[in-house]
Amino acid sequence: MTERSDRDVSPALTVGEGDIDVSLRPRSLREFIGQPRVREQLQLVIEGAKNRGGTPDHILLSGPPGLGKTSLAMIIAAELGSSLRVTSGPALERAGDLAAMLSNLVEHDVLFIDEIHRIARPAEEMLYLAMEDFRVDVVVGKGPGATSIPLEVAPFTLVGATTRSGALTGPLRDRFGFTAHMDFYEPAELERVLARSAGILGIELGADAGAEIARRSRGTPRIANRLLRRVRDFAEVRADGVITRDVAKAALEVYDVDELGLDRLDRAVLSALTRSFGGGPVGVSTLAVAVGEEAATVEEVCEPFLVRAGMVARTPRGRVATALAWTHLGMTPPVGASQPGLFE
C-alpha cells in the first residue's frame, strides 16, 4: 500500500503536484540541501568515475518518501553528463519489459528504477546479469524448443530507490556497489529548503515564518514545500501576500496541521488510543475501527510518524500511547504512562 496522497502532511506526491515538484528540484549536488554525508559520498563516486572515464558502481538510495531520492538520481545523471532513463518497479512486470528498456540504453546512461523493491521476480533475475555482466539472456519460444539468445547491454549505471530496503532480495542488494540511506531533515535544513523554494516561486517569506513551517513539516522537504504553497494561498487571499510567522500559524491552523506536524487523522488515532482505550495496549485493527480507517492506513500512514515523534510505542501486546501523546492532547498522563523509547 502507498500512502494516501490527500493529506497535506503526506510525503507522497499529490495529484497534479509533479510539475511543481520538478520546478523546485535542485540541479546539482551543490544546490542539494541536507544529507551532507550522502552528498559527500556521491561526489566521490561521481568524480572517481569521471576521472577514470568509466561508469560508477550501481547506486541504491534508501529512505522514507519525500526526502529527495528522485532528485538525487537526476543529479547523478546531470553530474555525469549522462542521459537519464526513468521507470519504476511496478512497471517492470515481465522480463521483456526490462529487456526492451535495457536494449535502448547507450553507454554511460543512468537507469533510474523507483520503488525497486516492487520489481517482479522475472525482471529482477534478468537485472542481475545486466548489472553484473552488461548482458541479458532473452528466451525465445516455449517448452523444450525454447532457446536463449544473449544480448549485449551498453555499460550503464543503475540507480535504484526504495522506501523499504529490507524488502529487497539479497542477490539484488548485493549487486549495488554503493548504498546510501537518507535520513529525515533537521528543522534548520528545512528552513533552507523553504527559503530556496520561496525564492524560486517568488514568495516573500519571513525567516521566522520559515521556521514555523519547517517545524511542522515532519522532517520531509516535500511536505515543507507543500505547506509553503498552502500558506502562500492563505497569505494572498487573507493577508497582504507576505508570509509572516503569524500568517503561517493562522494558515496551518486552517489546514489542520498542528505545531508538531500532526493532522486530523494523526490526532484521531491518538485520541482513540488515549480516550477510548486508556492509552493501550490496543491492536491496530481495533484502533483502525475506532477512527473509521483501514488497519493498513493506520499502520502504514499514521503510525511511522507517531512512533518517530515519540507519541506511540509498539509493544508485543499492541500500541501504547506515551506520556508525550497525553500531554500533546492537553491531558495529564496517567501514572505509569510509557516514556518515548521505552519499548523500542
Swiss-Prot record:
Residues reported to bind Mg(2+): 70
SUPFAM superfamilies, sorted: P-loop containing nucleoside triphosphate hydrolases, Winged helix' DNA-binding domain
Gene Ontology molecular function terms on file: ATP binding; ATP hydrolysis activity; four-way junction DNA binding; four-way junction helicase activity
Region (Small ATPAse domain (RuvB-S)): 186-256
Keyword flag Transmembrane helix: no
Regions crossing the membrane: none
Cellular compartment(s): Cytoplasm
Catalytic reaction(s) noted: ATP + H2O = ADP + phosphate + H(+)
S-S pairs: none
Keyword Kinase included in the entry's annotation: no
Region (Large ATPase domain (RuvB-L)): 1-185
Annotated residues for binding of ATP: 24-25, 66, 69-71, 132-134, 175, 185, 222
Amino acids binding DNA: 314, 319
GO biological process, one term: DNA repair
GO cellular component: cytoplasm; Holliday junction resolvase complex
Region ranges (Head domain (RuvB-H)): 259-344
InterPro entries linked: AAA+_ATPase, AAA_lid_4, DNA_helicase_Holl-junc_RuvB, P-loop_NTPase, RuvB-like_N, RuvB_C, WH-like_DNA-bd_sf, WH_DNA-bd_sf
Domain notes: Has 3 domains, the large (RuvB-L) and small ATPase (RuvB-S) domains and the C-terminal head (RuvB-H) domain. The head domain binds DNA, while the ATPase domains jointly bind ATP, ADP or are empty depending on the state of the subunit in the translocation cycle. During a single DNA translocation step the structure of each domain remains the same, but their relative positions change.
Protein family according to the UniProt entry: Belongs to the RuvB family.
Record's subunit section: Homohexamer. Forms an RuvA(8)-RuvB(12)-Holliday junction (HJ) complex. HJ DNA is sandwiched between 2 RuvA tetramers; dsDNA enters through RuvA and exits via RuvB. An RuvB hexamer assembles on each DNA strand where it exits the tetramer. Each RuvB hexamer is contacted by two RuvA subunits (via domain III) on 2 adjacent RuvB subunits; this complex drives branch migration. In the full resolvosome a probable DNA-RuvA(4)-RuvB(12)-RuvC(2) complex forms which resolves the HJ.
Role noted for this protein: The RuvA-RuvB-RuvC complex processes Holliday junction (HJ) DNA during genetic recombination and DNA repair, while the RuvA-RuvB complex plays an important role in the rescue of blocked DNA replication forks via replication fork reversal (RFR). RuvA specifically binds to HJ cruciform DNA, conferring on it an open structure. The RuvB hexamer acts as an ATP-dependent pump, pulling dsDNA into and through the RuvAB complex. RuvB forms 2 homohexamers on either side of HJ DNA bound by 1 or 2 RuvA tetramers; 4 subunits per hexamer contact DNA at a time.
Name of the featured protein: Holliday junction branch migration complex subunit RuvB
Originating organism: Mycobacterium tuberculosis (strain ATCC 25177 / H37Ra)
Gene it is expressed from: ruvB
